[in-house]
């Protein structure tokens, strides 16, 4: 660190610390996270020697947490240091330091988070299973953006917007998911009325999704857990109010990335 902060001289930005840590790290350590449909993300890194035990667990635990939150999953595989792996496994157990993280992933995938200590032979291979979704410009389509303070809907014919509206709503304060459902249906029907037919619906929404189901979303933060099933099916049910219309729901960040791809004609843009 070139410049020490005067109010907290001991503070080290975490982006700087791993770079210094890895300079003398030479022991391979692998992390994999498994999520729905057998998708597996693998991250390979290195650890220092046993003399740096505290630094090793700090580095490895941060890498596991990063991978879990960036990829999501219900199963973590660790290989390379059984002692470090056991400490991480304990952290994700009930009462452990990462109990919150484990609970979040349970809400996402509805199964307890597992941490598995592997041998090199047992460690899984990466399985990205990429899918092509969205980007359609043909036909008559509805685009819906479910935001936390307003909702936006557009009617699009052959790639051209023929109608668009923005309506203020307050889903974050509603404990009854009927409010979010009714607002979505109203938006769909308004856009549908501007076109001769509806060939498909695309939804951009805050939250994390498995398929079209919002598993964790701030839009439903006040909805009690016992009404969770209503939330999970909310967009599919709303689409059925329009007819037998295909619908795809995605996180708003993923939709923004798709829009960037469509504008630039290439992926991996920042």
PLM regions with names:
Residues 1-127:
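N-terminal accessory interaction module
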Residues 19-21, 28-51, 146-186, 217-221:
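Short glycine-rich, Thr/Ser-proximal phosphate-binding strand/loop in the N-terminal lobe
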Residues 22-25, 66-73, 135-137, 193-196, ...:
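Flexible, charged surface loops at secondary-structure boundaries
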Residues 49-61, 65-71, 87-118, 166-182, ...:
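Glycine-rich phosphate-binding loop and adjoining helix at the ATP-binding site
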Residues 75-77, 132, 139-145, 198-202, ...:
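Short glycine-aspartate micro-motif
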Residues 79-81, 204-208:
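Short loop/turn motifs enriched for small/polar and acidic residues
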Residues 128-162, 269-270:
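Gly/Thr-rich phosphate-binding beta-strand-loop-beta motif of the actin/hexokinase/Hsp70
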Residues 138-143, 181-198:
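Short amphipathic alpha-helices and their capping/turn segments at secondary-structure boundaries
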């Amino acid at each position: 660190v070139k410049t020490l902060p005067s109010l907290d001289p001991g503070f080290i930005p975490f982006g700087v610390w791993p770079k210094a840590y890895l300079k003398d790290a030479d022991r391979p350590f692998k992390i994999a996270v498994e999520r729905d449909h057998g998708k597996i993300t693998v991250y390979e890194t290195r650890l220092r020697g046993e003399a740096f035990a505290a630094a090793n667990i700090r580095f490895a635990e941060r890498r596991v947490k990063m991978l879990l939150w960036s990829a999501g999953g219900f199963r973590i595989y660790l290989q390379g240091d059984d002692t470090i792996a056991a400490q991480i496994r304990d952290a994700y157990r009930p009462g452990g330091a990462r109990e919150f993280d484990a609970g979040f992933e349970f809400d996402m995938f509805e199964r307890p988070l597992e941490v598995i200590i592997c041998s090199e032979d047992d460690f899984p291979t990466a399985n990205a299973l990429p899918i092509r979704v969205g980007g359609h410009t043909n036909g008559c389509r509805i685009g819906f953006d479910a935001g936390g303070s307003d909702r936006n809907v557009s009617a699009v014919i052959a790639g051209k917007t023929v109608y668009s509206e923005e309506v203020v709503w307050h889903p974050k304060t509603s404990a009854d998911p009927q409010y979010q459902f009714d607002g979505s249906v109203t938006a769909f029907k308004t856009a549908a009325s501007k076109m001769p037919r509806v060939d498909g619906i695309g939804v951009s929404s805050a939250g994390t999704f498995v398929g079209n189901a919002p598993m964790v979303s701030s839009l439903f933060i006040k909805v009690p857990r016992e009404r969770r099933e209503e939330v999970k099916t909310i967009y599919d049910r709303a689409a059925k109010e329009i007819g037998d219309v295909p619908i795809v729901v995605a996180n708003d960040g993923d939709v923004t990335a798709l829009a960037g791809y469509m504008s630039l004609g290439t992926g991996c843009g920042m």
